[in-house]
Amino acid sequence: MLAVSSHNLWIALAVTLAAGLATGLGSLMVVFAKKPNPRLLAFGLAFAGGAMVYVSLTEILNKSIAAFSQAYNDKLGFTFGTLTFLGGMLLIMVIDRLVPNPHQSLSSDDPQFREDNRAYIRRVGLMTAVAITAHNFPEGLATFFATLESPAVGMPLAFAIAIHNIPEGIAIAVPVYFATRNKFYAVGASLLSGLAEPVGAGIGYLALFSVLSDAVFGTVFGLISGVMVFLALDELLPAAKRYAQGHETVYGLVSGMGTLAISLVLFRFATP
């Protein structure tokens, strides 16, 4: 069993919790602020997508290959890393087919959101919360294990996931707020959904703690990299394109990749 630093463990839990609670920021935008700028939202979503794709392919997948290589040899390490990456995409693809995509939820501009249709709105809110909660479990695992192994990798990933969680908080808060007219319920529902990330991380860690090894880390990182790339391509970029009014998606994507690339270089120089 691999030794895990207690310092990294607490950092990983804190970072995962912070990323999950970003859903609350989205709900606050609904109940207290004006309608979000769609161009800024498009840029932010694409930025998060670019960051997630970059860190998944350049850092997390490479950590999977390195861990498998430590457990076996270089050829098998590359093979198993690639297979678990593809397995991660297949896994989240199945989940995505079984659970509705949270970014396809109705908005407050939808004609269905009328005062006399609160039962329908309440049902939409419940379905959205369940869908987003299900999607948050693998994101929590990704943030936690990436930070547990290397905070320099996990923190930028958590930042990208936090940006991604803001519109999810909006998606939950809109129907809940319209159905109940209660700000506390809207914010609370979003925060509870976000807590699925640290809960998922805790369950995953407890399940794997006794068997942590190079092979297990390789499997987890391979699956995480596949899941993150699929989520970025299937959820974040299409959602960004939907809000964009120009080239915000491309600019956000490139900015996200560039920012993550520079931050990882700086982390390398900052660590001894």
Curated annotation (Swiss-Prot):
Compartments where located: Cell inner membrane
Residue sites binding Zn(2+) per the record: 139, 164, 168
GO CC terms: plasma membrane
GO MF term set: metal ion binding; zinc ion transmembrane transporter activity
Keyword Amino-acid biosynthesis included in the entry's annotation: no
List of residues binding Fe(2+): 136, 139, 165, 168, 197
Membrane topology per record: Multi-pass membrane protein
Bilayer-crossing regions: 11-31, 40-60, 76-96, 126-146, 158-178, 189-209, 211-231, 250-270
Keyword Cell membrane carried by entry: yes
Protein origin, superkingdom: Bacteria
Swiss-Prot/TrEMBL catalytic activity: Zn(2+)(in) = Zn(2+)(out)
Keywords of the record: Cell inner membrane, Cell membrane, Ion transport, Iron, Membrane, Metal-binding, Transmembrane, Transmembrane helix, Transport, Zinc, Zinc transport
Sequence similarity: Belongs to the ZIP transporter (TC 2.A.5) family. ZupT subfamily.
HAMAP family on file: ZupT (MF_00548)
UniProt function note: Mediates zinc uptake. May also transport other divalent cations.
The protein, known as: Zinc transporter ZupT
